[in-house]
Amino acid sequence: MGTHKQLEVWKNAMELAKIIYKKTAEFPKEELFCLTSQIRRAVVSIPANISEGSGRLQPKEFIYFLRISFGSLTELETLLIIALELDYLDKKDYEKIQNQIKLITVQLSRLISVIRNKVELSSHH
């Protein structure tokens, strides 16, 4: 499959992590070990699991790690809604981040489908 660094979904997840780190640096300091920390852990998990999965030998293992990335992405969405409702994020920044999340969601879904189809094809031969 190649290295994870060649995957557009990984590149976009890395970009999302940078955006999130910059935005959460503006959150109130009392949130550093609470919401800020949870958001950062969730966003870092996305590209980290993509890279870990791509390093596995079995395609089914790769799919497993992509699904973990997907779960972290949905967790991130909820945490960002909380940040928005607490006025830690403004609507414009939230929408920009949401667009990146939507892109990564589509890319993860497609990659999982492509790998699943390859697994099914190889099992029929």
For each predicted feature, which ranges?
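Short, C-terminally biased terminal segments at protein or domain edges
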Residues: M1-H125
